[in-house]
Amino acid sequence: MSERMVRQFCQMVQIDSESGNEARFLAWLLDEVRGMGAEATLDGYGNLIARFPAVGSTTAEPILLSCHADTVKPGVGIEPVVGDDGIIRSAGDTILGADDKAGIAEVLEALRTAPVRPPIEFAVSRQEEVGLLGVKAMDFSLLTAKRGFLMDNDTLETIVVGGPTYVTLDVEVKG
């Protein structure tokens, strides 16, 4: 893990973004990805969609990398601390906010350092922690990638290639 990625992760978790209150973080991220050369916007729901051009590859199809911006509670006033063991923890009574700002930090670092890459579409949704509301409202017409990766796993060195579907049911009980 690079020092730059650790610094940026610590910077990101200090920007409050509990579910429903992600606007400040997403505005920061929008400026960040534009500064890295992306064409980027917020869709009508406030989800971030960014397109990064290919590097060293002109024929590859775009790949989607996806994360979410929101955190669970308590996620206001996070103070990250890097321990002597190299592990980043919250200094107080808050969560750390690694879910999913660690994924965002990984994507940003990969985009900065990859010597060759296909075009990348980067989608960062709002309100994942409260029922995937941002993804449900995302403007998919802004995306062209046919393949993608969700950067929201809790196990290092593991790739999840499938998972259960998110389903909601409305049940009416009579009697």
Language-model features and meaning:
Residues M1-R89:
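Acidic/His- and Gly-rich active-site-bordering loop/insert found
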Residues F25, E106, T165:
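Conserved alpha-helical elements of sugar-nucleotide-dependent glycosyltransferases
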Residues E39, V160-G163:
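Short Gly/Pro-enriched turn/cap motifs at secondary-structure boundaries
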Residues D43-I49, E129-G131, L156:
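Short acidic loop-to-helix transition motifs that present clustered carboxylates
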Residues I49-P53, L150, E172:
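Short, well-ordered beta-strand micro-motif
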Residues T59-K146, E172:
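Active-site metal-coordination/substrate-binding segment of hydrolases
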Residues M138-V161:
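A glycine-rich helix N-cap at a beta->alpha junction
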Residues T168-G175:
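Hydrophobic/proline-rich hinge and linker segments of small-molecule sensing/allosteric domains
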